[in-house]
């Protein structure tokens, strides 16, 4: 796992929790899907500065939509 500062780690944890609630999947399963698809380290972590300014609903919609675009979820 890449080294993440505390703020980014808390943000990633928040994102995983919100997406897991939306998709009715366990947080562990969401983490695996985000990690394995590259969304976690190629999108969420590098885009932290912008993404953390979004509302939780918009952020969750954005991540779920991106997961759908990449075929991670249907």
Task: Pin down the residues of each PLM region.
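Amphipathic, hydrophobic secondary-structure cores in small proteins
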Residues: 26-53
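Amphipathic alpha-helical interaction segments
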Residues: 23-26, 41, 70, 74
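A generic structural signal for ordered alpha-helices
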Residues: 1, 8-12, 37, 41, ...
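Long, compositionally biased
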Residues: 48-74
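Membrane-proximal intrinsically disordered regions of secretory-pathway and membrane-system proteins
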Residues: 1-4, 72-74
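N-terminal acidic leader/helix
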Residues: 4-29
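A short, structure-level motif marking secondary-structure boundaries and short turns
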Residues: 1-2, 15-16, 57-59
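Short polybasic/polar patches that bind polyanions
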Residues: 21, 35, 68
């Amino acid at each position: 796992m890449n080294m993440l500062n505390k703020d980014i780690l808390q943000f990633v944890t928040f994102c995983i929790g919100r997406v897991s609630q939306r998709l009715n999947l366990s947080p562990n399963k969401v983490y695996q899907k985000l990690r394995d698809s590259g969304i976690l380290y190629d999108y969420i972590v590098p885009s932290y500065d912008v993404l953390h300014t979004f509302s939780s609903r918009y952020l969750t919609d954005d991540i779920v939509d991106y997961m759908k675009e990449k075929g991670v979820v249907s």
